[in-house]
Amino acid sequence: MRILVTNDDGITSPGLHALVAAVVAVGHEPIVAAPSTDWSGASACLGPLDDQDRVSVDRFQIPGVVSADGSPVVGHAVGAPPALISMLADLGGFGPPPAMVVAGINRGPNTGRSTLFSGTIGAVLAGERFGWSGMAVSADVPVTGGTGAVGAPGHVHWETAAAVAQVILPWLVDAPQRTVLNLNAPDAPLAELQGIRWAGLAPVGGVRTVVTGRDDTGLDLDLVSNDESMPDDSDTALVRAGWATVTPIAPTAALEMELPLAEWERAVGRED
């Protein structure tokens, strides 16, 4: 199966490369197309683009990963956000359209409310619109204090999130069409993983944005860890406790709801 592998951290991210290796390991063909720059927090946006009529695409060899025939895996560095990359893949921009999308491995958690803003999850939800199943994969890399960047210095345990994703992928291939999963794993050695749990979304995400200053020309922002207490069965709490969490995500859909339509019509002067 041709599987789109993308992210929002950019084509050079080691997390992306680890996820590509996981796709190869389970016998599928990775179609690697990821942003040429960091699009973290892009959600499912399709822009802005420098040129609305053209998207830049450059070849990029994925380091340390070879395909089943031993040849290097060559991907695409794309001047676009991840959701648009999913759309371009569906349009045949990187060869025959893929049948599935996996996104990540994100540097930092995508739990709770953060799922709304995540470009990693946005890429997967965009793929669902094209009939694909998909999985967003994130590693709970801590926030560095005072820098506004996610990711502590030193080694990140990409291999843990990649190993869990590799186990789940065969199931996802056989799952009903348009199944969307959100996987978060702790940033810890695989031997220390507590296990894999279903989890609900926490009331808030694992990280949050704060305003640290303001003046006449703008606002200063920073990204900090969210130390609020979370429900025990939530994704944020379980990942903090050393579990990998899997949360099926519902795509955008209308809800059945009783609305005061007649009252609104009367208010705008339309009465039968």
Named regions from a protein language model:
Residues 1-9:
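Nucleotide-activated donor-dependent transferases that construct or modify glycoconjugates
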Residues 3, 19-90, 96-97:
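A cross-family phosphate/adenosyl-ligand binding-site feature
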Residues 9, 38, 81-82, 106-109, ...:
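Short glycine-rich anion-binding loops that position phosphate/pyrophosphate groups of nucleotides
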Residues 22, 123-128:
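Hydrophobic/aromatic ligand-binding patch that stacks against planar heteroaromatic rings
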Residues 109-118:
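Glycine/threonine-rich flexible loop motifs
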Residues 128-153:
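Glycine-rich phosphate/pyrophosphate-binding loops
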Residues 149-272:
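Electrostatically charged, flexible surface regions
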